[in-house]
């Protein structure tokens, strides 16, 4: 499982 959460 790959989940992308940007830190912007």
Swiss-Prot record:
Primary location group: secreted
GO cellular component, one term: extracellular region
Compartments, as annotated in UniProt: Secreted
The keyword Secreted appears for this protein: yes
Keywords: Amidation, Hormone, Neuropeptide, Pyrrolidone carboxylic acid, Secreted
Modified residues (Pyrrolidone carboxylic acid): 1
Entry-annotated residues carrying Tryptophan amide: 8
Keyword Secreted annotated: yes
One example GO MF annotation: hormone activity
GO BP term (any one): neuropeptide signaling pathway
Its job: Hypertrehalosaemic factors are neuropeptides that elevate the level of trehalose in the hemolymph (trehalose is the major carbohydrate in the hemolymph of insects).
Family label: Belongs to the AKH/HRTH/RPCH family.
Name this protein carries in UniProt: Hypertrehalosaemic factor
Annotated organism of origin: Tenebrio molitor
């Amino acid at each position: 499982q790959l989940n992308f959460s940007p830190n912007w």
